[in-house]
C-alpha cells in the first residue's frame, strides 16, 4: 500500500456519513458545540453557503450571515466533532461556485432565488 492509501484508510473511520447534500447558495443551520464553563451546549448558526472546499476529511463550507448590520462569515469543517448537526433550511439557485460577490452587496441585493427542484 502506498502512503496515500494508508492515509485515506485512516481518515475514512473519522468521516461522518449522516451529512446532508449541501450546495453553494443553500441556507443552512449548523449546530456548533460550545463549551462554557463546565457545560457543553449546541449553538445554532444559520446563514448562506458562499463557498465549499472538498477534500475528504478536510471538507469545509463557508457560511455567511448578516448580524446587526455586520457581515459575519464562519468556516466549518464538516467532519469535525465540533459540528453537531447540519440542516438545510432552503435551497438556493445560483450560477457560481463561489459567492464572494455577496460580500460587496447590501440589503435586498444579497437575496438568492429559491430552488424547488431539489428536496430540502
Curated annotation (Swiss-Prot):
HAMAP family cross-referenced by the UniProt entry: Ribosomal_bL19
Molecular function GO labels: structural constituent of ribosome
GO term, biological process aspect, one: translation
PROSITE patterns to which the protein is assigned, alphabetical: RIBOSOMAL_L19
A Pfam family that the UniProt record links to this protein: Ribosomal_L19
Function: This protein is located at the 30S-50S ribosomal subunit interface and may play a role in the structure and function of the aminoacyl-tRNA binding site.
Family: Belongs to the bacterial ribosomal protein bL19 family.
Source organism: Crocosphaera subtropica (strain ATCC 51142 / BH68)
Stored Gene3D superfamilies: 2.30.30.790
InterPro entries the UniProt entry points to: Ribosomal_bL19 (IPR001857), Ribosomal_bL19_CS (IPR018257), Ribosomal_bL19_sf (IPR038657), Translation_prot_SH3-like_sf (IPR008991)
Gene encoding the protein: rplS
Keywords: Ribonucleoprotein, Ribosomal protein
GO cellular component term, pick one: cytosolic large ribosomal subunit
Name by which UniProt lists this protein: Large ribosomal subunit protein bL19
